[in-house]
């Protein structure tokens, strides 16, 4: 039995390629160890059978953006640094239209954008793509967000019109919001760059109590049929 070495080193020796090429083959899901795909270049091997799959290419996986339907009550969601934890606990949507096979590399160095509070549910974005990170992290808040908010109580007369103009509450002016009734207990609220607590305070400012909220749209991108607790890839032609 030989001493264990990194899979990338063993593969490079076996193929006569560079260590970097070997790493790319492994990260791309092209390498099997005793019949199992291994995506970690640092995985230790000794006498196992190493196999390079047909059609293998030593190319970097392009950066991706992932969309998650966050469940209510997830305490990790308010922490942007917990992207990998959130995604690890979710499931890839079986009806994802993207022709991509999930790889470990797709979950590395993901940035959580526009995080939701613990009590909220709905659409969250994780991205490795610089242009998307810049657009969604823009402090000027140019991108609309749409929420369905379950409420209790009786609103004051003309309350929804006040929200559209910008209303003061607890010593600060809240962001302008377009609001309409979806049914007797649900409001559809559209606004830009809400801060934590803003939706609750918007409701309180017109005499309502927020029971729950769900984000259903960011920019032009709707959550649509993505099930709770599942994620999918952002499609090549989809835009926020």
Regions found by a protein language model. Name each.
Residues 2-240:
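Basic, flexible Lys/Arg- and Gly-enriched helix-loop patches that mediate nucleic-acid binding at interfaces
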